[in-house]
Amino acid sequence: MGIRVYKPTTNGRRNMTSLDFAEITTSTPEKSLLVSLKSKAGRNNNGRITVRHQGGGHKRHYRLIDFKRNKDAVEAVVKTIEYDPNRSANIALVHYTDGVKAYIIAPKGLEVGQRIVSGPEADIKVGNALPLANIPVGTLVHNIELKPGRGGELVRAAGASAQVLGQEGKYTLVRLQSGEVRMILGTCRATVGVVGNEQHGLVNLGKAGRSRWKGIRPTVRGSVMNPNDHPHGGGEGKAPVGRKAPSTPWGKPALGLKTRNKKAKSDKLIVRRRNEK
């Protein structure tokens, strides 16, 4: 999809851009694959804020996405490419030959009328899903499982892709979008191709209201809060932090502190860290 640039007819329109939605073929979703979605506004079951800067926004239906792709040897035809308000990638409605309908993440280059299939014997074509052990070295993939049968968990955002680097016993070496090289079981499935809608990250919202439509609330600096709201708060005028190092709103060190569990069992599966040269 291309980027649409607006003329500066108002202050809010100045520098505003949006996607032109040229790839979208319908604006009416498949009703049988919709479920209601209640806005949580970043609250947990006690009503306390657990994720800040969330709330409001347009009402949405959740689209049930098939991340497992486990209907082996059953062909499906792509019927539509659709917008999904719950994710950055577009989705594709596919009709299987046995009558089942499903949504999948739409990879770049997938077109209406194209046939896709899942299973170990599937061809290396965009949209086909197969075990990592059956995918040739150098192939770009997305929607990667971490545990066989659990469904794709990695590389699902717009424009994202990972590359198969080789096989090592029962594991497959995969280079992720971040640059991290990781061993994943060869029986885990992945879908061939790059996630579509790669222009998504280039959109300039242009005004605060568009963030509010998306359910994103303002992010306030700690230095302009009161001392009871943030460790950086208080003081006369533009006061410095007043601590040895910047802190989170809960008093923990911010900026540069490693938050990954030092005893994570998956450490042994990481061949190269994302920040290693």
Curated annotation (Swiss-Prot):
Q: Which UniProt keywords apply?
A: Ribonucleoprotein, Ribosomal protein, RNA-binding, rRNA-binding
Keyword GTP-binding part of the UniProt annotation:
no
Keyword Ribonucleoprotein attached: yes
Pfam families per the record? Ribosomal_L2 (PF00181), Ribosomal_L2_C (PF03947)
GO annotation, biological process: cytoplasmic translation
* Composition skew (Basic and acidic residues), residue ranges: 264-277
GO terms (molecular function) for this protein are:
rRNA binding; structural constituent of ribosome; transferase activity
Going by the entry's taxonomy, the superkingdom of the source organism is recorded as: Bacteria
Matching entries from SMART domains are given as:
Ribosomal_L2, Ribosomal_L2_C
Database matches in Gene3D superfamilies: 2.30.30.30, Nucleic acid-binding proteins, Ribosomal protein L2, domain 3
Which HAMAP family does the record associate with it?
A: Ribosomal_uL2_B
The record's comment on protein family reads: Belongs to the universal ribosomal protein uL2 family.
* Subunit record text: Part of the 50S ribosomal subunit. Forms a bridge to the 30S subunit in the 70S ribosome.
Reported function: One of the primary rRNA binding proteins. Required for association of the 30S and 50S subunits to form the 70S ribosome, for tRNA binding and peptide bond formation. It has been suggested to have peptidyltransferase activity; this is somewhat controversial. Makes several contacts with the 16S rRNA in the 70S ribosome.
Question: Which NCBIfam families does the UniProt entry name for this protein?
Answer: rplB_bact (TIGR01171)
> What is this protein's record name?
Large ribosomal subunit protein uL2
Provenance organism: Streptococcus gordonii (strain Challis / ATCC 35105 / BCRC 15272 / CH1 / DL1 / V288)
